[in-house]
Amino acid sequence: MPKFRILIVDDSVIVRRIINNILSESDWIEVVGVAPSGQIALAKIPQVNPDLIILDVEMPEIDGLETLKRIRQTYKQLPVIMFSAITQRGAIATLDALTLGANDYITKPANMGSKEKAIEYIRKQLIPKIQVFCHRKVSLTKHCLAPSMTSFQRKTSTQLLTLKLEIVAIGVSTGGPQALYQLLHKFPASFRVPIVIVQHMPPVFTTRLAERLSSQCKIPVHEAKDRDVIKSGEAWIAPGNYHIILVREGKQVRIQTIQTPPENSCRPAVDVLFRSVAKLYQGAVLGVVLTGMGQDGLHGCTSIREMGGQVLVQDQASSVIWGMPGMVANAGLADQILPLNKLAEEIIRRIG
């Protein structure tokens, strides 16, 4: 089987060397080129024919965003992973890059001076993401059948479509910012129930994402804070590095931010939120799993279904990565599997 070909683009020689060394440890990866600038990268792409590009966000002359724009003019489907700093500017630039067509991103370690820690930090983020795009390339020629509805699903769906839903809980990862925009901007200001969201992102990034979505949508979107009271027609996104759960105090439902251990290597984790809403709202929950890598949300959807709630998942064709929604669908937990552009309409229909 041919090796997976990668082009590294970063103005730092140290970073290029670290990434090159990490990738060279894997016998299924071939680093076919390195480039210190966007200009050189654009010239190299047709020469080395990469399967994936790792692209630094901040570079002199032509920065990562401009380089990405030019890549997308010619190479619509070539996967690009952005390499970004965990700063306000880095978060904004990364969200811009995802809007412009970047497939995913990784964040730079806070201290590049500690070489061993920096290497391990980058390795843990980067290799799993590359594996996903490698597997995706291999599977593109395979015909995938949508999982069929199980008897468990048919029974539950029929019983509960008449139950009044009281909350929407959304879990999403890779491809999430664009998916959330495409979903949330279709909800009217009069949306009847609260929305709580887990998007796998680090601190600062979740703050900027909430601000951006709130400016683009008819409903307010907040980064969740401890003891926030949730309200109908508003959305809350879990802050980076914190799980969120919901607790009832009298007639109010509040958010709790907690730092219990990561689940599925994630904090915030979809499973933590979904278990919480299933326990609190029982059958009055609509869980929605959008594009994302891994299986976070699978156990949470099991909890939602066991308590009598409903689950929708994004389909494979419209997902950047059909990991999280695919796991839920293949486990027979989804009431419906829908393209992203049909999900908002179905959510509104079910909420009533």
From Swiss-Prot:
It is found in: Cytoplasm. The modification 4-aspartylphosphate is found at D56. Its EC number is 3.1.1.61, 3.5.1.44. GO terms for cellular component: cytoplasm. It comes from the Bacteria. Residues 166-352 form the CheB-type methylesterase domain. The keyword Cytoplasm applies. The active site is at S173, H200, D296. It catalyses: [protein]-L-glutamate 5-O-methyl ester + H2O = L-glutamyl-[protein] + methanol + H(+); L-glutaminyl-[protein] + H2O = L-glutamyl-[protein] + NH4(+). Its main location: cytoplasm. GO terms for biological process: chemotaxis. Keywords: Chemotaxis, Cytoplasm, Hydrolase, Phosphoprotein. Phosphorylated by CheA. Phosphorylation of the N-terminal regulatory domain activates the methylesterase activity. Pfam families: CheB_methylest, Response_reg. Belongs to the CheB family. NCBIfam families: PRK00742.1 (NF001965). Contains a C-terminal catalytic domain, and an N-terminal region which modulates catalytic activity. This is Protein-glutamate methylesterase/protein-glutamine glutaminase.
